[in-house]
Amino acid sequence: MTQEKTRFSFFPLAVAGALALLTLPAAAELVAKLPQVMDPFFITIADGRMYIVESDVSAHIFTLGPQGVAFVKTFGREGQGPGEFDFIYTIRPFKDHLEVLGNTKLARFSLDGEYAGEVTFTFSAFKGAVYRLGDGYVARDLNFDEKGMATTLRLYDRDNRLVKEIGARSSSEGLNKINLVSDYYAARVAGDTLYVIEASRDKPVAVTVYDRTGVEQKTIVLPLEPVKMTPALREAVIKPLKDTWSRSSPTPWAEYEKRLFFPDRAPGLDYFEVSDGKFIARTWKYRGDQVEFAAFDLQGRELWRKDLPFTGRLSNGTLFCFYQGRYFYLRENPAEEVWELHAEKIL
């Protein structure tokens, strides 16, 4: 389906100059100030390089090392040509290249941000939810209207032809009944393995494992139970959205709030990744300005649970990542009108 941009800017910032260099932290603390960053949407770190997507169509590269953090370059631009984007949703680092996901293309760049080619996809995918799997792709699509919502996971070959439908889920919650803690149904790929994650308000989180051809192998149930909806949780979910509403939508907040629907329970998670041989999930359990994360091995055995700084949900992207046993996250410093990189040790 066609997607609209749902980003918003936190504040206009026009800062030039060198990046402040700070040593990497041993515990939770400021790592660096990032004057190059104005409107971040996504962050990831791999092999000593940090990539931050911002302003819809570009990304910054920084290096992280014993001497601190240093700005390298910015790559990407708006357009429809080679190496150009109408929107960048995510960057996936691999051993020798980057995959950069847009609305209808998957572009390849070197680890240093040099363009190296791209493929376009003609199938429908919601907000860049496309992964390479074997010689083809797996895509998640989301369609919704006033009456309800439908999510599908499909496998395609290298020529964009449908191979099979992995699964589909639907609900009666649509544009007139907006559920901010909706069920979670998504795909992740690591190597030649497809993981389909399902979390609902009725049962624990399940991860179903498929091979590269879409043949089901097994299902792993994670000890992440649905969370009771309380007035405090409801307020925690609404507040970040309400606080930024006037900057992100022309619709009056009171009108939008009338359409909100909160079930009696939230699903066991709202974020999931497969990273460094682990499952990592973010739950709906808030404690002050922190939220619970949990990690599991690939057999579903729990490795750790920890409350970590909350960076927002919904349209403001993913402003955190895990790297070398630390939780790195971006935080706005309004007083200095600058974005900062912080980190907290996990164990």
Language-model segments: what does each one mean?
Residues P12-T23:
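Bacterial N-terminal signal peptides
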